[in-house]
């Protein structure tokens, strides 16, 4: 999504959008590192000219701050939608977001409400990190706290879901999406899931969404 963007379906409910203008994954969910057993993903700040540090990201939907003390060292913030929102898995539900590593979070007071598309944070290096990024986790429903999961006792929100099932990527440029099933919203009814294109190893994909948000064009950006 882009700054100040709002997307409201014909039924009056917001469409949940991906919080960054460029999608560049640096660590996937699961695996054998700090995300083992979780559905958390790390994203780099990115722009038309490459890496962006302290990169702005925006409220995926209108949401309220429900926890600002989950991990003080990493400045974790948990937000909950103020109403049900449309999700790429075809459901309408409440949703919670955990954002981490912002060195200067703009909000700390529980109960603060931020409108969809407004600034909600920045990529950063707060806490135990190896570089500037956004640590992102999404959970379905109202905020229910967190949990430690095997095999490494890593933390995630309870009722976590895949980020690509929670955020549409309208007006987001996909630079490195690990071939996950990222989808755009064409409203008023969320489209069915589309199988990911089988790109070869080393292929990066860029997805351009036009202003109507109903069409998309995928091209190979470059082949390693």
Question: Which sequence ranges carry the predicted segments?
Answer:
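Short, surface-exposed polybasic-aromatic patches that bind anionic ligands, especially phosphate groups
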Residues: 220-224
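Zn2+-dependent peptidoglycan hydrolase active-site motif and core
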Residues: 52-54, 58-107, 126-140
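Residue-level detector of conserved, well-ordered beta-strand and adjacent loop positions
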Residues: 26, 44, 80, 100, ...
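Short glycine/threonine/proline-enriched tight-turn/helix- or strand-capping micro-motif at secondary-structure
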Residues: 20-61
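Active-site scaffold segments
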Residues: 40-43, 116, 121-122, 133-139
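A structural signal for short beta-strand/turn segments enriched in small hydrophobics and glycine
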Residues: 25, 63, 111-123
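Acidic, glycine-rich catalytic/binding loops that coordinate metals and/or anionic ligands
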Residues: 2-16, 47, 51-52, 109-115, ...
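Polar, enzyme-active/binding microenvironments
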Residues: 9-25, 34, 67-72, 116, ...
């Amino acid at each position: 999504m882009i700054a100040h963007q709002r997307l409201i379906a014909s039924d009056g409910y917001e469409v949940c959008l991906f919080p960054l203008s460029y999608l560049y994954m640096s660590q996937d969910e699961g695996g054998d590192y700090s995300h083992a057993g979780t559905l958390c993903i790390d994203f780099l700040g990115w722009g038309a000219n490459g890496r962006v540090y302290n990169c702005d990201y925006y409220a995926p939907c209108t949401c309220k701050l429900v926890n600002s003390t989950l991990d003080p060292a990493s400045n974790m913030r948990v937000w909950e939608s103020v109403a049900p929102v449309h999700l790429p898995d075809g459901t309408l539900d409440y949703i919670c977001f955990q954002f981490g590593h912002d060195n200067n979070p703009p909000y700390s007071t529980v109960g603060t409400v931020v409108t969809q598309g407004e600034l909600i944070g920045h990529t950063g290096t707060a806490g135990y990190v190896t570089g500037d990024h956004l640590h992102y986790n999404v959970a379905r429903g109202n905020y229910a706290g967190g949990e430690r999961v095997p095999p490494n006792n890593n933390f995630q929100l309870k009722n976590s879901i895949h980020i690509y099932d929670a955020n549409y990527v309208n007006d987001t440029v996909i630079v490195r999406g690990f071939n996950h099933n990222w989808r755009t919203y064409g409203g008023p009814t969320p489209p069915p899931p589309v199988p990911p294109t089988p790109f070869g190893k080393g292929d990066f994909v860029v997805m351009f969404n036009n202003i109507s948000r109903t069409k998309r064009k995928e091209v190979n950006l470059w082949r390693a």
